[in-house]
């Protein structure tokens, strides 16, 4: 089969779906990726035997002319490539790609990785996007979702029909061979957040909690790893990051295509403090696989990575004091208790987040199409 993967970011395809793309290639399928080339993807390599078609799109633009151009460009690519199946990811590919596939009679699946900005914010733009989403996804064969709460909301809001929904209970999965358990024992504790640098990811709460913790534990480090995307709604500016570094609250590590090199260091505890629904957060799943304790927001897409008190703590979103309390609670644990949390994180990853179960799901969807 010829299979297309269409996303709003080459980085997203390689980072989140790279293992699936390589797996389908190895099964003998012809795989083509369609996406813009974004800044974070520079330095990342397209897998051997896989083609990439670069396409212009304005990810965050609300100008309808930009979207019309994007739709007709997708239509042209799909007509020329004539794939047997297309997987779409993120809002604009899900809307315009699904419609283009429908017009050409091509089977497709849309992945709704999370209910982020469009579903969580009010305003006319979000309402229009929601209606477009609802209309377009009616033409998808399947709609992949990453947690039960998101599935429920999509069905209740009539964005998806129950028979369309495919629940990936372990999210998009983690390669447990790449992200191996590592000894986390250390005299030093580092609280690390791995995420796009957005206020929606809990940036402000992390900074304020860091200041509270450092009053009594000045030796503790709070670090941030992830791309800065100032074009995105609710992005944190580079100037704000600089100011927070100068205050001593945090250390910004920049961005890397190999997060395990930072996450795998001894003494790491992972933070993810999203204010709104996630799909199933990738960095937290990777942290579990590496054997890192977790502190995360008690929201869908984050809470699935934490067993309270066993491998970490859940905190209410936007609650700075609750976050600081959880960080201080972890610091008060004995070495044996911290080690137990690390072991429990790895066990959870092995039980729930193995990438092999996700590969099987893609295979089943394609098999249904062939039948």
Where are these regions (language model features)?
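Conserved donor-binding/catalytic core segment of Leloir-type glycosyltransferases
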Residues: 183-201, 206-211, 223
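Conserved acidic donor-binding segment of nucleotide-sugar-dependent glycosyltransferases
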Residues: 308-309, 313-320, 329-335
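Short His-centered aromatic/hydrophobic patch
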Residues: 88-94, 112
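Donor nucleotide-sugar binding/catalytic pocket of nucleotide-sugar-dependent glycosyltransferases
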Residues: 53-54, 134, 138-180
């Amino acid at each position: 089969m010829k299979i297309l993967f269409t996303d709003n970011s080459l980085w997203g395809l390689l980072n989140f779906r790279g293992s699936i793309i390589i797996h389908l290639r190895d099964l003998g399928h012809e795989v083509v990726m369609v996406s813009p080339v974004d800044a974070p993807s520079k330095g990342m390599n397209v897998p051997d035997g896989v083609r990439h078609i670069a396409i212009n799109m304005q990810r965050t633009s609300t100008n309808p002319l930009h979207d019309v151009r994007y739709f007709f460009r997708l239509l042209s690519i799909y007509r020329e490539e004539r794939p047997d199946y297309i997987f779409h990811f993120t809002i604009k590919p899900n809307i315009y790609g699904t419609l283009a596939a429908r017009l050409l009679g091509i089977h497709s699946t849309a992945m709704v990785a999370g209910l982020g900005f469009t579903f969580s914010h009010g305003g006319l733009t979000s309402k229009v996007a929601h209606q477009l989403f609802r209309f377009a996804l009616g033409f998808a064969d399947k709609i992949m979702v990453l947690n039960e709460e998101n599935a429920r909301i999509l069905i209740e809001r009539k964005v998806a029909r129950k028979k369309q929904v495919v629940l990936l209970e372990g999210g998009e999965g983690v390669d447990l061979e790449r992200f191996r358990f590592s000894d986390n024992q250390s005299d030093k504790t580092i609280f690390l957040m791995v995420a796009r640098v957005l206020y929606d990811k809990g940036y402000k709460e992390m900074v304020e909690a860091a200041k509270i913790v450092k009053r009594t534990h000045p030796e503790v480090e709070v670090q941030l790893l992830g791309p800065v995307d100032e074009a995105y709604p609710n992005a944190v500016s580079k100037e704000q990051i600089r100011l927070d570094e100068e205050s001593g609250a945090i250390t910004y590590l920049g961005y890397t295509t190999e997060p395990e090199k930072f996450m795998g260091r001894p003494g790491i505890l992972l933070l993810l403090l999203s204010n709104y629904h996630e799909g199933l957060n990738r960095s937290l799943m990777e942290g579990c696989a590496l054997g890192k304790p977790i502190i995360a927001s008690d929201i869908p897409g984050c809470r699935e990575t934490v067993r309270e008190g066993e491998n970490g703590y859940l905190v209410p979103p936007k609650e700075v004091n609750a976050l600081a309390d959880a960080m201080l609670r972890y610091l008060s644990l004995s070495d044996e208790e911290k080690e137990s949390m690390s072991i429990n994180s790895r066990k959870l990853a092995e039980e729930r987040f193995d990438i092999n179960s996700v590969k099987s799901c893609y295979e089943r969807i394609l098999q249904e199409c062939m039948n």
